A protein has these predicted regions:
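C-terminal accessory module of base-excision DNA glycosylases/AP lyases that mediates lesion recognition
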Residues: 1-17, 21, 26, 72-81, ...
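Phosphate/adenylate-binding glycine loop and adjacent helical scaffold
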Residues: 1-74
Length: 175
């Protein structure tokens, strides 16, 4: 039997581990802690599991909520989205959180957390010039992110994995 606060504490630990200093480096003072605190409080029980469209609407709202929580003027959409995607990926990978909140049911919809290393890996597979120039995390917009996510989905399908897992392959390829 686990104490009542076990899942809350575990979610906080996963949030702080997933969204580390290197994840949001250079995004502004206070962005790291605000992102960690926000992710530690995401209501994982409310993640929509009925459709990809509902999940995407939820994810967009969470990104907006995190942007509002950031303590800086120029709020970087890309950094907020990356933080949430990192957290959701690590929550999926955590046995307890994944089981408790049935996160495997949204595995196929989770986004790959975008950054320059992931984009470099994606671009190495872009033989048709489908991908735009990487604007950097600070200047990443939802529309540009979507182009990278669609391309990542195609690459993941070729590997027989969900898009969120492609991050591991691309990260290792860049080492």
């Amino acid at each position: 039997m686990k104490p009542k606060d076990f899942m809350v504490t575990l979610q906080r630990k996963v949030a702080f581990g997933a969204v580390g200093p290197s994840a949001v480096r250079g995004q502004g003072k206070g962005v790291l802690r605000a992102s960690q605190d926000f992710c530690s409080q995401i209501a994982l029980a409310r993640v929509p599991k009925s459709s990809a469209k509902r999940y995407q609407i939820w994810l967009n709202r969470q990104t907006e909520f995190l942007l509002e929580a950031l303590p800086i003027k120029n709020r970087p959409w890309g950094a907020a989205r990356k933080a949430i995607n990192l957290f959701l990926r690590d929550a999926l990978y955590n046995k307890y959180l994944s089981r408790q909140f049935k996160l495997r049911s949204v595995e196929a919809w989770l986004e790959i957390p975008l950054d320059s290393a992931v984009v470099k890996g994606l671009k190495s597979h872009d033989h048709r010039g489908e991908l735009p120039r990487w604007p950097g995390l600070k200047n990443l917009t939802q529309d540009v992110s979507e182009v990278f996510q669609v391309f990542a989905s195609k690459q993941a399908t070729l590997k027989g994995i969900a898009r969120v897992h492609l991050d591991m392959y691309l990260w290792l390829d860049n080492r």
